[in-house]
């Protein structure tokens, strides 16, 4: 709440290792486990009561629904670059999921930049594949240019200086 009330802070970028929505290389783990909610995260050596998808949704509730300032989720576990648009229209559950489903109040971008890792991971089919607007196994650097309320993201190959992707939000 302090963050939301602080008028000096306009934009927040949340960086974490594990993608909320993996696209290649980690569909059997990360925050998806091929849609299996049975795996439990561990805190202080003990499994928590809720499954991995439920815990993912709790994070989304905080970062997307309870905050207007979080602009992007920056991840890196997968050895690729992927830009994924997450909204309430994005399919984020397996077909047979019977537990409560989060309703996102706004959209957000997940930017995965694990492209410096090896080996590179190819894109795999997921429920949200249609929401991936760029996927690359090139080495890239992701740059954010912030000017007041405007944010411009540039994704550049650091060897060739080729512009791989860009986004304004």
Language-model segments: residues:
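Aromatic- and acidic-residue-enriched segments that line the glycan-binding/catalytic groove
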Residues: 28-36
């Amino acid at each position: 709440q302090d963050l939301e009330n602080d008028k000096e802070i306009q934009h927040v970028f949340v960086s974490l290792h594990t993608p909320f929505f993996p696209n290649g290389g980690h569909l059997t783990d990360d925050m998806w486990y091929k849609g299996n909610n049975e795996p439990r995260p561990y805190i202080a050596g003990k499994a928590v009561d809720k499954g991995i998808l439920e815990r993912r949704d709790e994070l989304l509730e905080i970062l997307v629904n309870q905050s207007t300032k979080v602009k992007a989720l920056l991840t890196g576990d997968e050895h690729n670059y992927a830009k994924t648009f997450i909204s309430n229209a994005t399919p984020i559950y397996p077909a047979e999921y019977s537990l409560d489903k989060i309703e996102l109040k706004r959209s957000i971008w997940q930017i995965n930049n694990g492209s410096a890792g090896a080996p590179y991971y190819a894109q795999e089919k997921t429920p949200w594949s249609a929401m991936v607007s760029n996927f690359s196994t090139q080495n890239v650097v992701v740059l954010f240019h912030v000017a007041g309320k405007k944010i411009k993201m540039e994704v550049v190959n650091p060897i060739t200086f080729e512009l791989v992707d860009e986004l304004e939000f």
